[in-house]
Amino acid sequence: MGIGRRKLLAVGAAVLALPARADTFPSKQIRWVIPFAPGGNYDVTSRLVAEPMGRTLGQSVVIDNRPGAGGVVGLEAAVNAPADGYTIVMASFTVGYVAPIFAGKQQMLQLLAPVSILTTAPTLIVTRSDSRFPDIKTLLAEAGARPGTVTIGHPGNGTTNHVAILRLQLNEKLKFNIVPYRGSGPGINDLLAGNIDCFADQLTSSMPHIQSGKLRPLMNFGLQGIPDLPNVPTLKDAGCTPFEGGTTAGVFVRAETPKPIVERLNQGVVAGLKDEVVSKRLRELGAIVRPSTPEQFTEALKADEANVGELLKVGALKPE
């Protein structure tokens, strides 16, 4: 895929072709596209960061939710916008590369330039507090013994959550009835209504429901435990082959955007993440706050590319 090389060529061409006016950027409000419905991990994180980011840049940052096709609808809004820095989008490797596969489109990472990582959020399997599954081993045992009877939701085809479910199935020789949604918000609502058995969700969007007692976490897809939820087993604790299933997501802009404007956006995002109120709230929600340079974000994307490559190689990652 050559993410790094394509990015450098695209950004280099943009700097030669367009006048870099970072000294006057921004001169109007910035649109921050969220490729999922309100209430999920992306939405919660972006809304927290947008306000202090706007203060730093001197212009308001307006959230624009564009759910659909596992994030592809939102990504299309970003890549079809002018390459002037006034439209940014929150995404991850899986949303930019894998989700388009499920939508029958080309991968979109080559059309985007990374600005900064925002957070890494643990991914959990959560269920209702009154669920028939007392623990993760009971759920996995049923998924193995009675293929297709356990319904598990995720925020959209090709998302990190979806990839984690597919990898769990492959590693443990299980079969779930997998149900995609247009974001975590609708999926959690369906879970609470009793329409599905469990949901793969980021801790940032599930934590309020866990704290209220409405949801119960069954397992953490990460390699490390969660300090605020020490009793939630990891994959290894549950007797499964361990892998990292957390979500590292950040801000992107069109690849042709001049580098000085990308750097100015980076300053705004990093300032937003370092805001004391924002960073405290994100940590309370279980996220690891990770302000970065564009180059550091590119390296993180390469690591995710290697992880997803295993599933592509064995044919486990394809439209269902």
Kindly label every feature range from the protein language model.
Residues 22-109, 149, 173-197, 291, ...:
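N-terminal (or domain-start) structured segment
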Residues 12, 29, 60, 65, ...:
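Conserved functional loop/turn residues at catalytic and ligand-binding sites
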Residues 27-29, 211, 237, 259-320:
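An extracytoplasmic/periplasmic, membrane-proximal ligand-sensing/linker region
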Residues 90-95, 154, 184, 201-206, ...:
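Beta->alpha turn/N-cap motifs
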Residues 120, 206-274, 306:
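C-terminal lobe and pocket-closing loops
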Residues 17-19:
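N-terminal signal peptide c-region/cleavage motif recognized by signal peptidases
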Residues 1-13:
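N-terminal secretory signal peptides and thylakoid transit peptides that target proteins
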Residues 80-86, 99-186, 235, 248-281:
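Hinge/capping helix and adjacent helix->loop/strand transition within the periplasmic-binding protein
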